[in-house]
Design a protein with these regions (language model features):
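Short acidic-glycine-tyrosine-enriched beta hairpin
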Residues: 67-82
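Structural motif
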Residues: 31, 60-62, 69, 85, ...
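A short, N-terminal "cap"/entry segment at the start of jelly-roll beta-barrel domains
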Residues: 1-29, 33, 109
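Conserved short histidine dyad/triad with adjacent acidic residue
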Residues: 33-47
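A cytosolic small-molecule/anion-sensing beta-strand core signal
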Residues: 57-58, 73-74, 92
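Glycine- and acidic-residue-biased ligand/ion/polar-headgroup-sensing regions
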Residues: 50-61, 66
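Ligand-binding loop in jelly-roll beta-barrel domains
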Residues: 82-106
Length: 111
């Protein structure tokens, strides 16, 4: 079976809110999300079974992870263990990549 190559420019941008949009690629056990957050965008407190790595390519995010405030800036990576409550706010217009393992099945089920 050939190894699939995904092109971000061929993946539809999914509008989550007026302030947040994303593109998703999935494998068998992991998911990669390209996420765009406008300054002031809020990701509410939540937790999931997936381990998460967030790599900020441009901008900055303020996270609250299990009660600890963490600022993640361009070029930095945040690891969030599975099951850990967290929320985020975009301090600037932000472009970031999220890796989830296992796949966030709840994201695939969304309309």
């Amino acid at each position: 079976m050939p190894t699939p190559v995904h092109r971000w420019d061929e993946i539809a941008l999914e509008k989550i809110t007026e302030m947040i949009s994303r593109k998703i690629v999935t494998g068998d056990r992991e998911m990669l999300a390209q996420t765009y957050l406008k300054r002031g965008a809020q990701v509410p407190m939540h937790a999931h079974d997936s381990e998460q790595m967030t790599y900020v390519l441009q901008g900055a995010l303020r996270f609250l992870v299990d009660g600890e405030e963490i600022i993640v800036k361009e070029g930095e990576v945040l690891h969030i263990p599975s099951g850990t409550p967290h929320q985020a706010e975009a301090l600037e217009d932000t472009f970031e990549l999220d890796v989830f393992s296992p796949i966030r099945a709840d994201w695939l089920a969304e309309p």
